A protein has these predicted regions:
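Acidic, serine/threonine-rich low-complexity disordered tracts
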Residues: 18-95, 119-203
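N-terminal signal peptide c-region/cleavage motif recognized by signal peptidases
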Residues: 13-15
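Hydrophobic helical h-region of N-terminal Sec-dependent signal peptides
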Residues: 6-10
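Positively charged n-region of N-terminal signal peptides that target proteins for export
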Residues: 1-4
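Acidic/charged, solvent-exposed loop-and-adjacent secondary-structure segments enriched in E/D, K/R, S/T
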Residues: 97-115
Length: 203
């Protein structure tokens, strides 16, 4: 079984100084790995490493990516992903007439100003299309504000806004829930996978 978890390729963006966040990835109430983000001015470096067992079989997910940004527009991307043996390599950069993205040696010209699923930048909530950094798919998305919700962050209860992003991809439907605090800082995520819900929890 191949488990495509599109959220693993997603980033914060547009932070003005070097910072680091580390999330635990929780699947069926068990920590299965970590996803770290390092932010240096207009650059985001993302690393994920997950390993879990299902039906007595081991599954592995590894992802490394570097994105650069000009405000809310992606300037370049370079990512490599091993989704339990399915390998993806994505590169892309702004060119004269758009954003040229190449995924596993197949190139596509996209609009010049695009965004990935950069959850740390709430501007994604205003988009109609987003690019999946894992495989380069440029997806139609539907974004909804579901309402306010209490959220436990590092042991403390805070009031958040809960958003939903849905999309259809070549690998099936995507349904992602995002929690933002009242300063619009991203604090949590949930997405459905074939074997259960996965959560991102800040360490």
């Amino acid at each position: 079984m191949k488990l495509i978890i599109c959220l693993l390729a997603l980033f914060f963006s547009n932070l003005s100084s070097a910072k680091e966040w580390v999330f635990d990835a929780i699947l069926n109430d068990e920590i299965v790995g970590q996803h770290s983000f390092i932010y240096e001015d207009d650059k985001t470096i993302s690393k994920a490493n997950f390993k879990f067992e299902f039906l007595l079989m081991d599954f592995l997910y590894q992802h490394n990516s570097v994105e650069t940004w000009d405000k809310n527009c992606l300037k370049s991307i370079s990512s490599e992903t091993d989704d339990d043996g399915d390998l993806y390599q994505v590169t892309g950069q702004v060119v004269a007439d758009g954003f040229l993205v190449t995924s596993n040696q197949e190139s596509t010209l996209l609009p010049q100003c695009i965004m990935t699923f950069a959850y740390g930048n709430p501007e994604i909530l205003n988009q109609k299309k987003l690019m999946n950094s894992q495989n380069g798919e440029f997806l139609d998305v539907e974004v909804k504000l579901l309402g306010e919700e209490n959220f436990i962050l590092r042991g403390e209860k805070i009031l958040t806004d809960l958003w939903q992003i849905s999309a259809e991809s070549n690998n099936g439907d995507m349904l992602i829930h995002l929690w933002y605090d009242k300063d619009m800082q991203w604090v949590g995520l949930k997405t459905s996978t074939p074997i259960g819900d996965m959560y991102y929890q800040l360490r």
